[in-house]
Amino acid sequence: MTKMMKAAVFYGKHNVKVEEVPVPEVKENEVLIKVAYCGVCGTDVHIYEGDKGCAEVHPPKILGHEFSGVIVELGKGVTNRTVGDRVTVDPNVLCDSCPACLSAKGHFCEHMTGIGTMVNGGFAEYVAVPVKQTHLVNAKTELIKAAMTEPLACCLHGIDMCNITAGDSVAVIGAGMIGLIMVQLARISGAGYIAVIEPVETKRKSALALGADEAFSPAEISEDELKAKNFNCVIECAGLIKTIEQAVRIAGNKATVMMFGLTKPDDAVSLKPYDLFVKELTLKTSYINPYTQARALKLIESGRVDVSSMVQPAIKLEELAEVLASAEKRAKGKFVVAL
C-alpha cells in the first residue's frame, strides 16, 4: 500500500490546498527527510501571487525551500548520512558540470533544479532530496533555527558583495527578517555605524536590539539628514521601487548600493545616471546562495546571528494559504510552518 502524507499543494495563482499525497520514493543518491519546519519566503509569496520567483513553477507543486528535519530513509547509494541525522537543506541543486559550475559560479548553473520551486519542497510532512544538498545540524541547535539557514545563506552572499570594511557606515532600509539579518552581518563585517530606516516601531526596536546604532522612521528624518551621514554602503531590503530609489539618493560618495529586496519582475525604477556619476556609486544585486549554506549554519549554531527573535509562533500547514494571502499578517514577522 502506498504511504501517504499531508502536503500543501500549489495549483496556481491564489490556489494552495492541503491534501493527502504519496510519500516520495527515494532515489539512489537521495535521502527522505521528515520535515520539522519550513519557512515562508518572499519568493513563495511571489509564486502564490502569480509572479515569477527565482525559478519557473509549473503546478501542481509543493512549495517551500527553507526547511529542516530528520533523515528517515537512505537511498541505496548514500554512505555519508544515517537515519536519525538532523539536517537542513540547500534547495538549489547544481549540475556540477556546466561552465558556470566549473568556474565557481554555481548560482548561474545552466541546469539548476530548485527544491520547492521546480520540484516538490518542504511544505509537506516528507521530502526527498539529493544527499549532497543536506547539511548536518548539531544536537544543540533547534531545528526551527536550522530552517533559517537558507535565508541567512542568501544574506551572506549579499553582504560579501557589499565589501564592508572596518569602521564603515552602513544603512539598512527595511527591518523585516532579511533586514535584521543584514544588520547583524554588517556588524560582524566590521561596520562602525549602522542605521536602519523602517516605518514600523516594533521592527525599529528589534533592529536596535540586534546591533543597529540608530533606527529611524522615514517620516521622522529627512533625506538630507540621511545623506549627511555619508553612508559607505546602503542595503535595500524592502524590495520596493521607492526604497530602491531612496537608497541611491542617500548613499555617500563612492558608496555601494546593494539592491537585495526582490521586486516584481516588471517593476522599473527611475534613476538619474548623473547622480550615480557624480558620486561614483556602485550598484549591486545579489542572487540566491552560492556556496554560503555551510557558513550560514555555522553562524546559527554558534549563536553569532540571531534568527529566532523575529520569527512568529509556528503555524500549521492549514494556515499557510492565509499567510501567503495576507500582507498584513506577514508584516508581523517571519512565519514558519511546523510539520
Give residue spans per PLM region.
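Glycine-rich beta-strand-centered segment in the early N-terminal region that forms part
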Residues: P22-C38, K52-P99, N138-T141
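NAD(P)H dinucleotide-binding glycine-rich loop of Rossmann-like/cofactor-binding domains
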Residues: C95-I173
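Short glycine-centered segments of the SAM/dcSAM-binding site in methyltransferase folds
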Residues: R86, S169, A255-T256, T282
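N-terminal glycine-rich cofactor-binding segment
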Residues: V9-E25, G42-E73, T88, G106-N120
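C-terminal hydrophobic helical "lid"/dimerization subdomain
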Residues: T2-K3, E245-R249, P290-L339
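Conserved beta-strand positions in the Rossmann-like core of class I SAM-dependent methyltransferases
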Residues: I194-A195, M258, K284
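Mid-domain Rossmann-like dinucleotide-binding core that forms the NAD(H)/NADP(H) cofactor-binding site
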Residues: T141-E220
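Glycine-rich cofactor phosphate-binding loops and adjacent beta1-alpha1 units
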Residues: C162, K205-E280
